[in-house]
Structure formats: C-alpha cells, structure tokens
C-alpha cells in the first residue's frame, strides 16, 4: 500500500473534497444495516472482578448474541477497541497481556487503536502482542524518526455486505509526555487531528471507501476543554470537514460518553439507562468507559452513501450496585440481567488466570526491617511505609514532593522477602498515580488545607519531601526538599487519583491546567520501585519529625 508524503497530501486538501466518491458496490436505494460494537481502556481485565463483574467470558456471550441478532435482521457487525489493552491487572501485566489479546481474538475484534499504555513496555513486547492478535493495530500518527515512516498500519479496510468501510487509528500525542521516555528514542508522535486530514485524503484518493470511521485513543473532553491534556476527539471532530468521519470510537479519558446536554456529559451515568452519544460537526463520538464494563452498540442504516445512526446504547456487562437493606445488611445486585460466561472463553483464560496468581507469589525484592502500614499507625503518624510509597510515586513522576491519604495504606510489609502479593495487600485499590504542577502559592494553599485532616481518620496525610509546623489552621516553616517554598516557583506534586478528585476531602486538583493522569496503577509503581531499589533499608525511610501539629 502506497501512502502520499505528508506535505503533498496536505497541499491537496484544498483541491479535493473529503467526501467519499467510491466506485460503488452497494445497491442504489437499498438500506443496509451496520452495527458498530466498541470497547476501550481494557487495562488487563480479562477475568471477572471480585464481584463477578465484566470479564471477557461474559463479553463474548454478549457480543455473540448481538452478532446473531444482527445477522437475523440481515445486518453486519464491526467490533472495535479504543486501545489501552495493557497495564492495570497483575495477572495480565505479568504475562504481557497475552490472555487479553487471545481472548479478544476469540470474541472476534476487527481492529484496535494503539493506546498510550501499549508503550508501557518496550516496542519488542508490543510487536509480540501484534503477533498474538488476529486483528490489526492501527496508529496513523506515530512515526520512526530515523526513517520518517509510520510504525503501524494507519488504517484497515473492511467490507460488510457491499459496503467498503475504512477504519483509521489515532492516538494522543501526549503519549510521549506520559509514557516511559526510554522507549521513545526513535519515535515521533504527530498531532492526530492533522494526521487525520492527511489519512482521510489518502483514503479517498487510493481506497475510495463508502464509510470512514476513526478508532482513537485521545480522550473526550466536554466542549473541547482539554486543559493540560492534548486535544481529544471533540477538538479533532471540529477541525475536520463536516461529516468527513461517520463516527469516532474513542478511549483514553475512560468516560461513558453519555451526554446530559449539548457539550456536557452526564456526571454520574447509571448503568442500563439511556445513553446519548456526542455529535460534533456531523461526526458521532462514542466511548464505553473502561475495563470492559460496557459494550457500546451503535446501529446504523446505510443508504445511498449516507450513514444514519438509528440506535445507540451502552450495554453493562454484569455491573452491580451496592444495596443496603432495612436490616443493615448489604449486598451487590445487578443493574441488568446477568450475562452468562462463555465456556470456551473460560477454558482459554483459566490457565492464564491460574498462572498469574502463581506469579504473584514470586519474590520481587526484600527489606531489612518492618515497613509500617498498620491502620493504627498510618492514620496517626508519618510512617516509613508512607515514605516508600511516596518515594515510588515521586520517582515515577519526577515530582518534588508527594502527598496521599494514610487510609490508602492497608497493610505492613515484614522484614524479609517481598512478593507482588505483598504489594497488592498494601495498595489494593488500583488508584492511578497522578501529578500536578503548581505555583509555590498554590502549594502553600494546598498543604494548608491538607494539614487540616485530623489523625484517627483515613484522610490523615502521609507526606514526603515536605516539612512544616501546623498550628491553628496555619503552616509555618514550610519547606519542600529542605528549602523554603518560593511563591513564584513551580513545584510538581505526586499523589493518587483518589485524592486528586477530592477523595477524603482533599482539595481537587484534577481541574488544574498542570494536572496529568499518568495511567500507572499505584501498586505497579510501588512494585517497580522495590525491584529497582532492593534490598530496601527500612531505616532510610523512617520519618524524623519533618512535620508536626501543635
């Protein structure tokens, strides 16, 4: 397949319309039924959750039933992923997501966008994952610097009935910023919106599809307000010629894109209720939250070159809510009827699940003394476990200091060998490590608020590289890394997504321009830190009265 050089293609944009003009294979005045199914941000959740939610076995049952229904009505199905198959569940991470890709094969995925977390591993791992997958990895806007060539297929062509459908893959150019830089030495991430214009032109000149769809990993931001993130799907849709894409199957921001009103998503979407997708500049935009919690279903009618959406829904995959009864007892109940797990998928995945569990018992490091994480300590005083966790987050983010709720530390680690299971007992919640760049004045305001969190509560803060004296709601002698805070200087703070979004009453920082969600799970970050720094010296992390409350 030959592709036009970028500059030539851009120059031709002014001369050619982006609407498709195919050599038509479809019948005039005939209505075709096309169903697009989609998921995104799978993050290693090939197995059901501890509450029996989602998982690829139930997803296969659901997708199979939809395929059967659509086929009975004379229609066709295309199944797409918005990327980020990697990173999030130890049983998957330890096996380079092999169970996830093999499970996706069995379900019958047609294509996926390459997400930023596909680059959490070296490129050799991603190439191995391509070999496991029986569907193409699409990424139009990543190039090899040394050759100027694309590293992945920019698009794939599918024929459904007599309709020629092109699917483009695009990924956030933030990947270079939030990923591991050692893997990007010869990789260039170009602006996806600009690359989309080039690719659409290439397609219309060379392939002449009837329909063009983009599967993306760029994020959905209400009204295009992307803050410090790179522009997402909304911004791209607005930048393209109207209707040049039939739809964008998105990912990255991990939202149910269910609109409450124009340019505003529902804040707390309830599973099983109606979901109105976004539409910008004649282009539908969809996203199915995360982890396989939903399968998105978009039913289209194609007639005489036009794609019309006639139905859209997010279908929950065994999602449950916690209900407390009058007698005080509580249980988790399904939002919608239960979806049975597919036996063939269970047969495929069970050995991987068992292998992953066994690997959790493997030694990852050691420590020469107790790392104190007991509830009776972390909610009252600074502890060496808190310092180790925050040191790991600081190392991963390049932060100047770190803060987190003591209640997020759930266990101690005894002297001796450390296993991954030990780490997961300390940090079992799967929070994301995040950071924010703030002015010195903002740091003072933030830490003053955090210092109000009282002992004997989960909100009591564990801190690293911070010293102060707190008295009567004010801080004195506040220092970061031993130096007084400069109001005009910029500081980077590492914390967890839970606290960043206001958890435990902490000030929200996820709306700040300098906020970045790294996507890295807290336990994985701690595990890597232990591996790189073992044997740990417990005494080296012992607090020394840096912070005090009078």
From Swiss-Prot:
Example GO molecular function: 5'-nucleotidase activity
The keyword Disulfide bond is annotated on this UniProt entry: yes
Result of changing residue 449 to R: In strain: CDC 179-87, CDC 331-86 and CDC 655-84
Entry keyword annotation includes Repeat: no
Effect of residue 388 to G: In strain: CDC 179-87
Compartments it resides in: Periplasm
One Gene Ontology CC term in the entry: outer membrane-bounded periplasmic space
One of the GO biological process terms: nucleotide catabolic process
Cofactor(s) needed: a divalent metal cation
Binding-site residues for a divalent metal cation 2, renumbered to this chain: 84, 116, 217, 252
Annotated residues for binding of substrate: 429, 498-504
InterPro entries, per the entry: 5'-Nucleotdase_C (IPR008334), 5'-Nucleotdase_C_sf (IPR036907), 5'-Nucleotdase_CS (IPR006146), 5_nucleotidase/apyrase (IPR006179), Calcineurin-like_PHP_ApaH (IPR004843), Metallo-depent_PP-like (IPR029052)
Family matches, as Gene3D superfamilies: 3.60.21.10, 5'-Nucleotidase, C-terminal domain
Entry superkingdom: Bacteria
Outcome recorded upon mutating residue 393 to H: In strain: CDC 179-87
Leader peptide range in chain numbering: 1-25
SUPFAM superfamilies: 5'-nucleotidase (syn. UDP-sugar hydrolase), C-terminal domain, Metallo-dependent phosphatases
Site (described: Transition state stabilizer): 117, 120
Keywords carried by this UniProt record: Disulfide bond, Metal-binding, Nucleotide-binding, Periplasm, Signal
Listed result of changing residue 197 to N: In strain: CDC 137-85
Protein family (similarity comment): Belongs to the 5'-nucleotidase family.
Name the record gives this protein: Silent protein UshA(0)
Species in which this protein is naturally found: Salmonella typhimurium (strain LT2 / SGSC1412 / ATCC 700720)
Lineage start: Bacteria, Pseudomonadati, Pseudomonadota, Gammaproteobacteria, Enterobacterales
Gene name of this polypeptide: ushA
